[in-house]
């Protein structure tokens, strides 16, 4: 049997997983700093649930992995974390609102494979239900900038409002039943250009006259400010969208993030579930051209699930861990899983105790040489694993109550008191922050 992975999946070896775990921890820490609560939902769902928001959207539906269980029920692997979250809120009416949750988990899409995009991947999501104000969007965008600062990645966020976009299309007499097709085409404008949009809408069955109107409208809007759209399009949806965008912009200015938040009147986020603000996050350096995060407001999904068709104001943001990993792996040296490597020289019993002492009294990550390798080979291992410090402990060291501390980066050695490993003064001899 040939050993290979399913197309679009990948094994992550320890040196890769270290960085992926760092990203996950950064997400968790940032999300919790904003008062978000953790949630976990099933990977396996009813197909009817997972296909709900994509009704009529064949481009999305064809990417859902489907299967049947032994009871002949139609099931699906979750395509994202948004619908499972909406299901949880709909099933638990006693959840206190506003409810801010985060979830980090695997999702599956049978779509094209490209840089940073696989068919099995991890999303890191935050959603807020119960807040009508675009202050929620501003906070999520602020959180995104904070997360990427933590990861030393410079990003911009493009944003728009679906009310504005839908109002523009309504004002140029695009039939309601064709709006989704046009939006899906406009969503690609930065990738395929205006000529590509024209070709795409024609392929979707839009008439040439309507295609020309769409393209001319796009060109006429490119230099408009947010406020200009009210005058350019006498439409109530446009007016509502402008009002929400202006309020959001005020919050972004107050937060000091408006400079890196860019209004894009044709950003669409193709999914039909969005009802207001939408946004996408991009790397400033363009090393990855696709978005590394996205989201928006969807006020109708939970009410539809609950069957009362009430408005449950909800807004979310999603970060792709895998694409962030790709960006970081291009610029960051993989760090070690251990801070200190202990090499016993005939002192295995004592070193076992010392390793346990350090783990139990400090936050140091400690690895002990277990394979009985000679000193040279053990040091070579520590060097290849990027472990910053090595403790060399032989019988001579124990007799003088000292140990040898080797700085692997500098190649220097110093003798430190054995007592420092027991009284928490070890950090005086190295540059590793120790939490007691």
Swiss-Prot record:
Keywords: Aminoacyl-tRNA synthetase, ATP-binding, Cytoplasm, Ligase, Nucleotide-binding, Protein biosynthesis. The keyword Protein biosynthesis applies. The keyword Cytoplasm applies. SUPFAM superfamilies: Class II aaRS ABD-related, Class II aaRS and biotin synthetases. The lineage of its organism: Bacteria, Bacillati, Bacillota, Bacilli, Bacillales. GO terms for biological process: histidyl-tRNA aminoacylation. NCBIfam families: hisS, PRK12420.1. Its EC number is 6.1.1.21. PANTHER family: HISTIDINE--TRNA LIGASE, HISTIDYL-TRNA SYNTHETASE. InterPro entries: aa-tRNA-synth_II, aa-tRNA-synth_II/BPL/LPL, Anticodon-bd, Anticodon-bd_dom_sf, His-tRNA-ligase, HisRS-like_core, HisRS/HisZ, HisRS_anticodon. It catalyses: tRNA(His) + L-histidine + ATP = L-histidyl-tRNA(His) + AMP + diphosphate + H(+). Homodimer. Disulfide bonds: none annotated. Its main location: cytoplasm. This is Histidine--tRNA ligase 1. It comes from Bacillus cereus (strain ATCC 10987 / NRS 248). Belongs to the class-II aminoacyl-tRNA synthetase family. It is found in: Cytoplasm. GO terms for cellular component: cytoplasm. GO terms for molecular function: ATP binding; catalytic activity, acting on a protein; histidine-tRNA ligase activity; transferase activity.
């Amino acid at each position: 049997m040939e050993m290979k992975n399913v197309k679009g999946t990948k094994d992550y070896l320890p040196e890769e997983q270290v960085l992926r775990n760092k990203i996950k921890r950064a997400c968790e820490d940032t999300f919790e700093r904003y008062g978000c609560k953790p949630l976990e939902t099933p990977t396996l769902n009813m197909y009817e649930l997972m296909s709900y928001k994509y009704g009529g959207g064949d481009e999305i539906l064809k990417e859902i992995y489907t299967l049947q269980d032994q009871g002949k029920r139609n099931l699906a692997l979750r395509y994202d974390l948004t619908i499972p979250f909406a299901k949880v809120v709909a099933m638990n009416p006693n959840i206190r609102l506003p409810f801010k949750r985060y979830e980090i988990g695997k999702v599956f899409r049978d779509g094209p494979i490209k840089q940073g995009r696989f068919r099995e991947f991890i999303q890191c999501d935050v959603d807020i239900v119960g807040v009508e104000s675009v202050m929620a969007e501003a906070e999520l965008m602020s959180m995104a900038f904070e997360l990427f600062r933590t990861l030393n990645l410079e990003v911009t966020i493009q944003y728009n409002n679906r009310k504005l976009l839908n109002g523009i299309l309504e004002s140029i007499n695009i039939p309601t039943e064709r709006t989704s097709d046009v939006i899906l085409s406009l969503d690609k404008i930065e990738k395929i250009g205006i000529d590509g949009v024209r070709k795409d809408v024609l392929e979707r069955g839009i008439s040439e006259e309507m295609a020309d109107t769409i393209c001319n409208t796009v060109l006429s809007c490119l230099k408009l400010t947010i406020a200009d759209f009210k005058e350019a399009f006498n439409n109530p949806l446009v007016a509502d969208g402008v009002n929400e965008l202006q309020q959001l912009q005020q919050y972004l200015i107050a937060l000091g993030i408006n400079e890196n938040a860019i209004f894009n009147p044709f950003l669409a986020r193709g999914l039909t579930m969005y009802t207001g603000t939408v946004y996408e996050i991009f790397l400033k350096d363009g090393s990855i051209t696709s978005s590394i995060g996205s989201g928006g407001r969807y006020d109708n999904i939970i009410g539809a699930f609950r069957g009362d068709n009430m408005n449950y104001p909800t807004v979310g943001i999603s970060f792709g861990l895998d694409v962030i990993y790709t960006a970081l792996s291009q610029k960051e040296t993989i760090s070690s899983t251990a801070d200190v490597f202990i090499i016993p020289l005939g002192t295995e019993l004592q070193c076992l105790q010392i390793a346990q002492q350090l783990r139990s009294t400090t936050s140091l990550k400690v690895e002990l040489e277990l394979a009985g390798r000679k000193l040279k080979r053990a040091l070579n291992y520590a060097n290849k694993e990027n472990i910053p410090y090595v403790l060399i402990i032989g019988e001579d060291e124990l007799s003088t109550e000292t140990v040898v501390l080797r700085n692997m980066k500098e190649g220097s050695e110093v003798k430190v008191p054995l007592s420092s490993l027991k009284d928490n003064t070890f950090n005086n001899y190295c540059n590793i922050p120790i939490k007691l």
